[in-house]
């Protein structure tokens, strides 16, 4: 996962992790754990889809952030 790219997209959209987390259905602490892959935590496919929608990511951006 490319956390820096995701954080950059958040900045482009003038959003914070605290703004995005509830829109994905996560608490801020759980979102951060998944963002930092703490303890092997990963975003689920439904969470990736929600992030893609909220941040208006295209397919290439989504793949670069979550699957590279």
What is each stretch, according to the model?
Residues 1-15:
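A short, Lys/Arg-rich alpha-helix, primarily the initiator
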Residues 7, 32-33, 63:
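Key DNA-contacting residues within the recognition helix of helix-turn-helix
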Residues 20-21:
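Short alpha-helical "recognition helix" segments of helix-turn-helix
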Residues 25-42:
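Recognition helix of helix-turn-helix/homeodomain-like DNA-binding domains
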Residues 46-61:
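DNA major-groove recognition helix of helix-turn-helix/homeodomain DNA-binding modules
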Residues 61-68:
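Short amphipathic recognition helices of helix-turn-helix/homeodomain-type DNA-binding modules
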């Amino acid at each position: 996962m490319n956390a820096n790219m995701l954080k950059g997209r958040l900045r482009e959209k003038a959003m914070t992790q605290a703004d995005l987390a509830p829109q994905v259905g996560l608490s801020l602490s759980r979102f951060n754990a998944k963002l930092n892959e703490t303890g092997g935590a990963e975003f689920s496919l439904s969470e990736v889809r929600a992030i893609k929608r909220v941040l208006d990511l295209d397919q290439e951006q989504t793949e670069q952030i979550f699957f590279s």
